[in-house]
Amino acid sequence: MSRYTGPSWRLSRRLGVSLSGTGKELARRPYAPGDHGNDRRGKLSEYGTQLREKQKLRFMYGMTERQFSNLFVRAGKIKEGTHGTNFMVLLERRLDNMVYRLGLATTRRQARQLVNHGHITVDGKRVDIPSYEVKVGQVIAVREKSKNLDVIKGAVEAVVARPAYVEFDADKLEGKLTRLPQREDMNADIDEALIVEFYNK
């Protein structure tokens, strides 16, 4: 299954969650798109509820189904912790997500483009793979020739707060993952237990 590239605001309203992280999609119309979106939400089946939760998280991180399910399998092989929490930690450690969490981009989609276009380095080496798994202590930075990009400067200026598990140097435009995130650090709107149930059927 390919990555969704349509309008994120429409998908956000359909799933009932802000995929961009800004909340703007749901501010004016907190219901599904379409002529009858305001009264179209009926009771979902157990499978439908699990599927919607899975889709919410997958689209939030901008991944294909294959990428998403493969990472889920990897999370299941980690011996410590719960499957669901380990899965969410692996999602958070993706390079595109870390670029977003550091505030170098306003959305994960924008962060993925920065990585794809070679604007980001890890420990001084250019990395253009969005799914690259960031380790604790690795330094994520903007390449010297990319530091004057308006999209990056605008994103940094717009940051209100950053997660407790990262630190950032605005002068150097670099930061790092200081520790692995705990469940309470991550999205409270996601019920990962439903996703575990979906894949374990």
From Swiss-Prot:
Residues 22-47 are annotated as: Disordered. Residues 93-153 form the S4 RNA-binding domain. CDD domains: S4 (cd00165). The keyword Iron-sulfur does not apply. Keywords: Ribonucleoprotein, Ribosomal protein, RNA-binding, rRNA-binding. GO terms for molecular function: rRNA binding; structural constituent of ribosome. One of its GO terms (cellular component) is small ribosomal subunit. It comes from the Bacteria. Part of the 30S ribosomal subunit. Contacts protein S5. The interaction surface between S4 and S5 is involved in control of translational fidelity. One of the primary rRNA binding proteins, it binds directly to 16S rRNA where it nucleates assembly of the body of the 30S subunit. With S5 and S12 plays an important role in translational accuracy. HAMAP family: Ribosomal_uS4_B (MF_01306_B). This is Small ribosomal subunit protein uS4. It comes from Limosilactobacillus fermentum (strain NBRC 3956 / LMG 18251).
